[in-house]
Design a protein with these regions (language model features):
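Targeting-peptide/extracellular-domain and disordered-appendage signature
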Residues: 2-218
Length: 218
């Protein structure tokens, strides 16, 4: 935000003018090999490479994505994320690229509430138009209502950032993000059905390491 003038404000309110939009929900399981070197482990996030007795549900090929049931959190997996990509055009013809990402990460497998909840939520927004970049991030603890998800109706939130819909599916839906420097309010519909990626949602993510994911897109 430092490269923006303090009083400059971007506000986007767009209805049915999404050029391209993709949403993915992913739960990823990572197995670290005992022989991995310190350099190799250093390339993986500190949260994912924790060496402890914590055991999360593995992503296995005999499981599959089932919609609309999987429009929800999957706390048995260590982490998952949702991505919202859009390209919009304002009334002057200026094009803006938008990415909003939302992550849930568990530090261990405990099912506890309040401040003992092991989940961490992170979201970031990036907007660019070729000459400017606007960006902001939010981080929240789980278990205290600061961030979370419901699916009847569908809603992802962290602080005052919301992706919500009237029904149990993400679309048609609304993404509402506001910061001190910029804000956007996007109403979105889809032009086709949801797509389950890979083999019924299962995708191998690394040729050598035991890394796989479940994912779907719109």
């Amino acid at each position: 935000m430092k490269n923006m003038k303090p009083k400059k404000r971007l506000s986007l309110s767009v209805l049915l003018c999404i050029v391209a939009i993709t949403m993915t929900g992913v739960a990823l399981y990572l197995t670290l090999w005992a022989e991995a070197t310190a350099t190799e482990q250093g390339e993986i996030s500190d949260v994912l490479k924790r060496e402890s007795k914590t055991v999360f549900e593995p992503v296995l090929p005999d499981e599959h994505v089932s919609l609309p049931d999987d429009f929800r959190f999957h706390p048995d997996y260590q982490h998952e994320w949702w991505n919202y990509f859009a390209k919009v055009q304002d009334k002057h013809g200026k094009v803006y690229n938008i990415q909003w990402s939302y992550f849930r990460v568990a530090t261990d497998e405990r099912d506890t509430r309040g401040w003992q909840n092991p989940h961490l939520f992170i979201a970031h927004i990036v907007i660019s138009n070729g000459s400017h970049v606007w960006k902001e991030q939010r981080v929240a603890r789980g278990g205290i209502g600061q961030a979370g998800m419901t699916n009847r109706p569908f809603r992802l939130w962290i602080d005052n950032w919301n992706w919500r819909a009237l029904g149990s599916t993400p679309f048609p839906g609304n993404l509402d993000v506001a910061t001190d420097a910029f804000a956007l309010d996007l109403n979105t519909t889809t032009s086709g059905p949801f797509v389950v990626n890979g083999d019924k949602g299962f995708q191998v993510k690394h040729a050598l390491q035991s890394i796989a994911s479940f994912s779907f897109s719109a």
